[in-house]
């Protein structure tokens, strides 16, 4: 029987979903505007129309999704929290969504193995995934994550700087940007989040 007690099982994250730990490592990760709501439709922005996101694509409906990256270190690990940051500039960039990392996948056998792993959970169509794989000699890695929560109120880059989550415009995340537990708590408060899914 599924256990809904407030604890995290890092060996089987689905078993204790949707809870995440406040004390886990947390990263802010950028996502381009054109991919944001395609991957995270529950986090649709006020400037977007729901009618543009009604088609039944697997990656939109799945709780388990993937984020393809070539970012340099540091990288998150299983059980870490990731906060998605839609890029767009000083006022338009916003943090919108929390996920929890289920797996970091690096050891793909070949291109087809990469495609098979990503295609139903990524925003990218197969031809784009193939282009990503072939782009450089250094191969991408994939973060498989569980979608957890979207922020009721989205704070932008300016607010993140004012709150000292970011150190300035040049501190905007380009890869996986680690933040402290205190900064995570600041984001939760500023976004007016219901913290019932958060445990210590």
Which role does the model predict for each range below?
Residues 1-46, 107-200:
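Contiguous surface segments at macromolecular interaction interfaces
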Residues 5-11, 62-66, 78-80:
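Short linear interaction motifs
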Residues 22, 77-79, 94:
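Short gly/pro-enriched beta-turn/loop segments at secondary-structure junctions
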Residues 30, 85-86, 98:
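Short His-Asn-centered micro-motif
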Residues 31-74:
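Short N-terminal edge-element motif at the start of the domain
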Residues 71-88:
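Short coil-to-beta transition motif at edge beta-strands of beta-rich domains
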Residues 94-105:
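Short beta-strand-centered aromatic/proline hotspots
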């Amino acid at each position: 029987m599924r256990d809904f007690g407030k604890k995290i099982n890092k060996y089987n994250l689905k078993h204790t979903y949707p809870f995440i730990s406040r004390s886990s490592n947390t990263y802010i990760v950028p996502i381009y505007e054109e991919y944001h709501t395609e991957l995270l439709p529950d986090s649709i922005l006020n400037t977007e129309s729901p009618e543009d996101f009604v088609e039944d694509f697997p990656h939109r409906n799945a709780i388990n999704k993937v984020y393809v990256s070539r970012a340099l270190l540091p990288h998150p690990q299983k059980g870490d929290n990731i906060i998605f940051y839609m890029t767009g500039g000083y006022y338009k960039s916003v943090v919108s969504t929390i996920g929890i990392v289920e797996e970091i996948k690096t050891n793909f056998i070949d291109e087809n193995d990469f495609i098979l792993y990503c295609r139903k959970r990524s925003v990218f169509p197969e031809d784009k995934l193939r282009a990503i794989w072939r782009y450089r000699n250094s191969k991408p890695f994939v973060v498989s994550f569980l979608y957890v929560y979207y922020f009721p109120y989205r704070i932008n880059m300016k607010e993140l700087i004012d709150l000292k989550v970011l150190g300035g415009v040049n501190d905007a995340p380009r890869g996986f940007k680690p933040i402290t537990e205190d900064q995570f708590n600041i984001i939760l408060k500023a976004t007016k989040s219901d913290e019932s899914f958060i445990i210590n």
